[in-house]
């Protein structure tokens, strides 16, 4: 999860929404990392998610599902806002939890 959020941060740094709209490679890279982030969140044990309900896990996973299954309905403006505004906030929420995630029992698969 940290890798995906870090990559998104690097990708959007010094870029504009206009470049996101017009650059297919850039847009695809951001969307792929959001997919990875959502899949990693989906692999967390329900007990871990419940213990950290301050994180909106369902939205993280839900976005992954929209990108993968409803790709023709993606709202680019919303994805841009998520990548530039919500992912940095999510990073702040998840970073303190990383020690728990790397201990046995935090995840069901590597993140």
What are these regions (language model features)?
Residues 2-111:
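Solvent-exposed interaction patches of small proteins and small membrane subunits
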């Amino acid at each position: 999860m940290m890798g995906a959020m870090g990559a998104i941060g690097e990708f959007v740094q010094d870029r504009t929404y206009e470049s996101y709209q017009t650059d297919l490679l850039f847009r695809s890279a951001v969307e792929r990392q959001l997919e990875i982030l959502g899949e990693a969140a989906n692999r967390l044990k329900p007990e871990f998610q419940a213990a950290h309900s301050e994180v909106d896990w369902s939205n993280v996973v839900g976005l992954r599902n929209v990108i993968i299954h409803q790709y023709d309905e993606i709202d680019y403006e919303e994805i841009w806002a998520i990548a530039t505004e919500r992912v940095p906030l999510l990073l702040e929420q998840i970073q303190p939890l990383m020690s728990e995630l790397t201990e046995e029992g935090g995840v069901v698969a590597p993140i």
